[in-house]
């Protein structure tokens, strides 16, 4: 038996298709740091804003943001930061399920599907303003480049950089 984490009195509730959630997590998990002095970089940030779930992660040098739009609107917007180990477990356990019910308060979160429930504590710090890095409406960035030339340039750069090279 596992120790009880305490009852979650849900402040926020969300229902999502498991394949959508797992896809979003797979698109962001590679940016989550394993160990960091800054705790907020060791998790995936879930932000619900009306009818959109956005999951973002950053490892200071990399940033990943993935989102999905819901058919229904949720009345309460919220942001929570979920530890990397929990993200990995969600991907592993819920990949081939139907709907996942997510309940959270300010300290912990639960993911439920069928007869499986995953509980986790939340990271209490957030990475602020990740979305400001990509202000496409204010600063549109578009580039059209030759794929072959880009791959060749990438290979040349990788030949002169190493693991010790910053940036």
Q: Predicted regions: what is each one?
A:
Residues 1-167:
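Structural preference for solvent-exposed beta-strand-turn elements
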């Amino acid at each position: 038996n596992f120790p009880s984490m305490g009852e979650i009195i849900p402040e926020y509730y969300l229902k999502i298709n498991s394949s959508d959630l797992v896809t979003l997590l797979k698109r962001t998990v590679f940016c989550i740091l394993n160990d960091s002095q800054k705790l907020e970089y060791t998790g995936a940030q879930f932000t619900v804003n009306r009818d959109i779930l956005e999951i973002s992660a950053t490892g200071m040098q990399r940033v990943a943001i993935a989102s999905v739009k819901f058919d229904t609107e949720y009345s309460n917007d919220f942001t929570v930061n979920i530890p990397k180990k929990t993200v990995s477990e969600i991907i592993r356990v819920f990949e081939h399920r139907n709907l996942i019910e997510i309940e959270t308060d300010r300290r912990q979160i639960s993911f439920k599907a069928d007869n499986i429930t995953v509980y986790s504590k939340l990271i209490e710090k957030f990475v602020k303003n990740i979305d400001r890095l990509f202000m496409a409406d204010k600063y549109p960035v578009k580039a059209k480049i030759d794929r072959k030339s880009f791959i060749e340039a990438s290979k040349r750069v990788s030949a002169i950089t190493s693991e010790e090279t910053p940036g």
